[in-house]
Amino acid sequence: VGNRWEAWLHLVRRLMDVQLSQQPDQLYWKLTKNGVFSVKSMYLDVINSSVVPSSIHVWRVKVPLRIKVFMWFVHKQVILTKDNLAKRNWMGSSRCSFCDHNENIKHLFLDCPLAKILWRSIHIAFNINQPTSINMLFGTWLDGVDSDTARHIRVGVCALLWAVWNCRNDLVFNRSTNIHFLQVIFRATAFIRMWSLLTPTEARERLVTASTRWEMV
């Protein structure tokens, strides 16, 4: 009882110091001067802090900011896959759009039969084993790979996951009937070629060559 009373008195003292404003409340984003949220301000805050150390490479890879944010959401496992929608009381089917299993982030990007074929094609093209978990994908997966190669691979992984997500959404929202794994690869390599414009000329050529090699598997 004594501790509760002390806690209550402490709370009362804290509340007495609060000055209530007569103005209506409003949302204010503290990372911008005008108080309005922007992705850029969030991005700069993240890369200059240690909030997500295991996914720091995502913020440094040469892809559009939108893709970096998407990859960060994948890492945090908060993109709106059907299991996450169900947590928001969504009542739709929980089945994966590519197969008959329940959809979650790990299944969609790693365990789905379609995903396994895609990762197998990467293994054949570049002799890199598939990560076994989302944490591994953003953590130790590329340990031991030289930095230049790892940098290019990360661009490819961004393209792969973004292509899978786009194809999944085509099935869900655009009523596409089916998706062949080659469609996903071609879409991913198209993203790589487009994003290669963000890199210096020499690195751009290596990215384009790698994407062509992937298509030929």
Residue ranges and their predicted role:
Residues 1-217:
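A helix-boundary/hinge signal
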